[in-house]
């Protein structure tokens, strides 16, 4: 593993037998930690460029994978477009996985796309968005009327930029793209562990319409397969990732109750319940994010959050299998919690 820019610039003209080079954002995150080993196992033997503000933290999260000769941890800030462009050029990056969030997500993401264009080495992008149809037809039909959460709405804008505002791959600075649209992470439930075990209360207001759930490992697999595809089959497509079945707050509390053998009650998604949720979340994150999350859950209550049968089948094609079971996640999680208590 190397640190910094100890590599010569590589030409963007690659032969078919040249191993690809992928720049992976958020490599220490829920998706990234699962994605890195998948990419290292691919027959194409890609080189992985992992930018980070904290190399020591990232290396500790990667465990033994951080010592692989094809892993290059680069110290720098992905919010700096100059750093990004230099990194893409220096390492001859051929494809990127962009997984970004934050209050400045729009500017950082657009700057990222611009750096890719200027570098002229990147030929494919896998962009992490969110589950849902964010196309023009849906917008004209009124989809945005209930979307008030900034971290969700920004993805509509970014998807529109990709669909209607980037240079074609065949042109200088152009690249193809695949959008991954995950539903609500299984792992979100782990934030409610203390509330579930000590208070018998599932504190996430998922609403009465139902939301799809997704294993971050499935998102990582979809991303790995989309990077490997390099725009041959999945270019210009958005693939939803998650369960076809949706789960209400009551459904979720009932599942946890069944496995734990004790009654778990569900958070309400009416005005009073969402006010209480925001108050709780303000103790965990800043006030901007607390309100933004409340607005997202309000959308879930009004509209639900899921995918069609056709979208689900497209996912199965990309994954090469059905997505993971939410019920099985709960079973495994409770077993682990019980083992932790007994040790």
Where are the regions that the model predicts?
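Short beta-strand segments at enzyme active-site cores
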Residues: 126-128
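Residues that mark the N-terminal boundary/hinge immediately upstream of a DNA-recognition element
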Residues: 247-248, 311, 325
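Terminal hydrophobic/aromatic helix or amphipathic segment near a protein terminus
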Residues: 253-306, 342-343
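Amphipathic terminal alpha-helices
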Residues: 314-343
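Oxidoreductase cofactor-interface core, primarily capturing Rossmann-like NAD(P)-dependent enzymes
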Residues: 3-5, 13-47, 51-61, 79-81, ...
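Short, amphipathic alpha-helical "lid/cap" segments that border enzyme active or binding sites
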Residues: 85, 110-113, 216-224, 326-331
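"… SH3/SAM/PH, and C2H2 zinc fingers" -> "… SH3/SAM/PH, FHA domains, and C2H2 zinc fingers"
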Residues: 36-39, 46-55, 82-84, 241, ...
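NAD(P)H-binding glycine-rich loop region in Rossmannoid oxidoreductase-like domains
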Residues: 50-120, 132-141
């Amino acid at each position: 593993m190397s640190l910094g820019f100890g590599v010569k610039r590589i030409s963007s003209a690659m032969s078919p037998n040249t191993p690809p080079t992928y720049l992976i954002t958020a490599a220490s995150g829920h998706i990234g930690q699962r994605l890195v080993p998948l990419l290292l196992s691919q027959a194409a033997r890609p080189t992985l460029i992992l930018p980070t503000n904290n190399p020591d933290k990232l290396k500790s999260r990667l465990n033994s994978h951080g010592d692989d000769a094809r892993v290059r941890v680069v110290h720098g800030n992905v919010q700096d477009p100059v750093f990004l462009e230099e990194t893409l050029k220096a390492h001859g990056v051929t494809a990127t996985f962009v997984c970004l969030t934050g209050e400045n997500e729009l500017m950082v993401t657009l700057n990222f796309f611009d750096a890719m264009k200027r570098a002229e080495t990147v030929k494919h992008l896998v962009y992490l968005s969110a589950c849902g149809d964010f196309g023009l037809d849906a917008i004209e039909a009124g989809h945005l009327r209930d979307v008030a959460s900034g971290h969700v709405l920004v993805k509509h804008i970014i998807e529109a930029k990709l669909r209607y505002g980037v240079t074609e791959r065949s042109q200088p600075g152009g690249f193809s793209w695949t959008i991954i649209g995950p539903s609500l992470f299984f792992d979100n439930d782990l934030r409610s562990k203390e509330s579930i075990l000590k208070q018998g209360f599932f504190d996430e207001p998922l609403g009465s319409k139902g939301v799809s759930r997704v294993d971050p490992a499935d998102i990582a697999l979809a991303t790995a397969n989309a990077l490997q595809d390099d725009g041959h089959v999945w270019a210009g497509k958005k693939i939803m990732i998650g369960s076809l079945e949706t789960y209400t707050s009551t459904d979720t509390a009932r599942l946890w109750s069944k496995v734990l053998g004790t009654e778990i009650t569900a958070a309400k998604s009416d005005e009073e319940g969402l006010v209480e949720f925001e108050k709780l979340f303000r103790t965990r994150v800043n006030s901007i994010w607390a309100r933004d999350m409340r607005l997202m859950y309000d959308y879930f209550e009004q509209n639900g959050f899921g995918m069609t049968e056709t979208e689900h089948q497209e996912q199965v094609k990309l994954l090469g299998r059905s997505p993971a079971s939410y019920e099985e996640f709960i079973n495994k999680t409770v077993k682990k919690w019980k083992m932790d208590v007994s040790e």
